[in-house]
Structure formats: structure tokens, C-alpha cells
Amino acid sequence: MKFIAIIPARYASTRFPGKPLADIQGKPMIQHVYERTSQVFAHCCVATDDTRIAEAVDRFGGCAVMTSPDHRSGTDRCAEALDKYSKTTGTAFDAVINVQG
């Protein structure tokens, strides 16, 4: 079976704006989540609607997929990212893991 882990990340969170970029021991929070996730899954990406998050992911060598800002949930964001990632890589997946950071 082929698995993909997708980490939905929004900058404009209502409870903790900017959470994905919050510094934790010298790294943005999203990097900590991505590094641990990529230790388990061969295919891993961050789904975001914010260029600041995408740029941070690019800086540490991760995979970021830009998604629409109009999604009502992280699951909707993951679905769009899965579609884009699958088309870009030509890979079909059997299961999607929605990783919350």
C-alpha cells in the first residue's frame, strides 16, 4: 500500500495565529512536525494557503503544496493537496494520513 501524510497548515488560525511558524528551539513548529512525519512516511507534504509557510517549508527542504484559502476544514485542504501532489508526482495513494501539528 502507498501512504501519504499531509500536514494542513494555516497562518490565520483563530486560536493561535502564526502557529506553524512559531519558533520552538530554533525551528518553526511546522519543521518539527514535518521532520517527525517524514521519518515514518516516504511521501509527506504540508498543505497551506500562506506563502510564508510554504517558504519556510522550502527553506528546510520540505514539500509544500499551495492550496485555496477558501477551504472550510483541514480535511478539504488535504484533499486539494492530495490531488495536486498526485498529479505532480504521477503517484496514486491507497491511504491519506491527515497529520495535525
Segments from the language model and where they lie:
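Short, low-complexity, intrinsically disordered N-terminal peptides in bacterial proteins
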Residues: 1-2, 89
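Short phosphate-binding loop-to-helix
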Residues: 52-101
